Amino acid sequence: MSSLSRVLRGTFNTCPIRRFSSAATVVSEPTAVTAAISPPQKSLTSLVNGERNPKRIVEKFKKACESERFRTNIAVYDRTVRRLVAAKRLHYVEEILEEQKKYRDMSKEGFAARIISLYGKAGMFENAQKVFEEMPNRDCKRSVLSFNALLSAYRLSKKFDVVEELFNELPGKLSIKPDIVSYNTLIKALCEKDSLPEAVALLDEIENKGLKPDIVTFNTLLLSSYLKGQFELGEEIWAKMVEKNVAIDIRTYNARLLGLANEAKSKELVNLFGELKASGLKPDVFSFNAMIRGSINEGKMDEAEAWYKEIVKHGYRPDKATFALLLPAMCKAGDFESAIELFKETFSKRYLVGQTTLQQLVDELVKGSKREEAEEIVKIAKTNDFLKLKLNLPSQEE
């Protein structure tokens, strides 16, 4: 049975009777007395955030959830789920989120939608779907809020076809009217499944439904166009934003900077960067990475290195993408000395750099008869006290 069929079946086979999960007894809300003697929310949050052992994180989180105030802390829920996902402990994600069903908060749509979203961030779409199906049993209404959370959960789980199916089927079944957030989620899903033309076509549908495309709508389409090499389409979307007086933000500028960089349009790129600064917005590391990319694409390594220095001058730290651009480009240009110095800087200043990027550096050094230097990099990557990486040293024959 398809995911959509299971959702629809669950949607219409649940009875709207006040019933809570049998997995746990419903916990009543704290009285004024118990609230007064409960640990402060800040200390509970610190206990959870400060723990590093996944099992202990779960234990402390579940204990902290007994506090009503703690259960309103969206950030700590999000952070805890992300940490458990990073540790590949999805069963622990399920444990802490299923624990929430014993609280009456689950009868509030906002709280239920949050749990659906968290399951989505963990890629656990079936659990998200189950929470959505169970909402009527908890006398919890399902409006566009929880509908959007479900769409997002499937998108984050990369079930793009299901997002499209749910968007087309559920609103009519549940008497829900999709809003601009619904459309934005669908557009993101279509872009991520390489259906850019269908995503762009939704602009007309949005307006025909009496809705107004917002900055998220346009930024999604703009970035997807430039990333997929559809430069002219990206320029059309940019022009439409200007025509409709959409308030352009830093992400809009960064998307177009990337598009111009990929096309090696240096003059337009520099002009747009100047326009960005004149607008009152502050360029960020993504802006500078685009400028670095543009310089590299035109073979101007001196300019690329100058833009790199601007990142720190503007109060930012270079990211993995910065080094993924610069290190291979330096090697390609035969400037191994600069590449080695940049590598050393990443570790001395504790900048994050990807393992794939460093492996490329090692490979290029060996090809360039710099085996001794390559060996040093492999050793530093393995023995440093910041970011231990296992790099492979190519054999002499390779």
UniProtKB/Swiss-Prot annotation:
UniProt-annotated location(s): Mitochondrion
Residue span of the annotated presequence: 1-19
GO cellular component term, pick one: ribonucleoprotein complex
TM annotation in the entry: none
The PPR repeat ranges on this chain: 108-142, 143-173, 179-213, 214-248, 249-283, 284-318, 319-353
One Pfam family this sequence matches: PPR_2
Protein name, entry field: Small ribosomal subunit protein mS78 (rPPR3a)
Source organism: Arabidopsis thaliana (Mouse-ear cress)
